[in-house]
Amino acid sequence: MKHIVIFLALLSTSCNLFQRQQQAGESVVEEKQQQEEVFVPVEKELYVINPTTMRYTVPDIHREPKDRLNSFGHLLEIEAESEHFYKIKSNWNWYLRKEDMGSYEDIQFTKEVLEDVHFIGKREGDTFVDEKEGTTLSKYFTIDLISYEAYQKAKKNGYFPLVKDTLAIKKKEGILSLPCNDTVVKLKDVEMTPQDDLEVYEYEGEMQPIHQYLIAGYYYEAGDKFFIDKRTGHETEIESHPYLSPNGKYIITLGVTEMGGATAIALYKVLNKDPFAIELVVSAWIRYWVAYEASKNRPTFFGKDGCLYVAMDALDSYEYNYKEEDKPCKYVRIKIK
C-alpha cells in the first residue's frame, strides 16, 4: 500500500511538471509569434480593398481583431509594415492585415459585394416595406463588373432620351413655367424665411419618348426629382434621377440615399404612356458602391442591349475622387431580370 501511495504521488508530480512545461512552451511559442511582427518604417498610401476588413489594436494574427473597419475603398497612409500587418498613420495604434490593403486596381468587387444592400423593398405611402431577410439586388438585376473599354464601346451606341431645351424653358423672376397641352405648370422658388421653407426648382430636361419634363426640387436639407406630363401637367414622383430603357418598358433611378452615402436604386415598370403611369417594382440602398450619376464625362446610360451602364466606385473612393474626373473609377453593367 505504501508503495502505491508513493507511486501516485510521483505520478501527480510528473503530470504537474509536464503541464507547467507545456504551458511554458506554449507561452514561448506565443511570445515568439508576437515577436515575429517586426515593423519597418515606410511612407506610402494604400486602399482598403476588402469590404470586410478587420481592425487590430495588437499586431498578432493569432488574436481576435478589435472590430470591423467599414472603410471599403478608403485611401490610408501607412507608416510601418511587418510580415503580416500595416501600421496605419494615426493618433491611435491600429493595424490592418496586408491582404486587406492594395492598389486601386486591387479593390475587390465580387458579385456578392455588387449586389449587397442596406435595405430592399418598396414604399407604400410613407412606409418602407422590406423584402425578406437576405434578399439582395440579384432578385431583380444581374450586375457585372466590366472594363473601361466595354463601357466606352457601349457608350458609342448609348441611349440618351433626356433632352434639355434651355431656349424654350427658362426661369423668370423665380418662376419656372412649363407649357403643357392642357395648361401651363408654374413652379415658384421660395426663399427661406422664419415663415417659409426653402424651395428651388430647376428644369433638367424633357424625356421625349414618354412626354415628360424632368424637374429637380431643392429644399432645406432635402431634394427630389419628379416628372411633369407635357400633355396634362400631371406630376409623377420618382426616387431620383431616371434612366428610361430603350424599349420604354422600364425606368431605373440612381441617386444618393436620404441619409447620404452609397447609391439608392429603384426600378419602375411603365404601365402606360398615355395617360402616363408607372409602378415601383423595388427600391434599395446599395451597401458598398456609389454611382457617378451626375458626371458629364462618365454618364450613366442604357446601351442598345437593354443594360444600364454605370461608372461607380467604392463609397470611400468616390468621396476622394468625385471632383476629379481624370481619376480612375470602376464600371458595372446592370441587366433587368
Language-model features: locations:
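Conserved blade-ending motifs and adjacent loop-strand segments that build the rim/top face
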Residues: 280-297
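Surface-exposed loop/turn elements that mediate protein-protein interactions on large endomembrane-trafficking
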Residues: 174-193, 220-237, 266-285, 323-337
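Boundary regions of SH3-family modules and the immediately adjacent low-complexity/disordered segments
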Residues: 23-41, 89-136
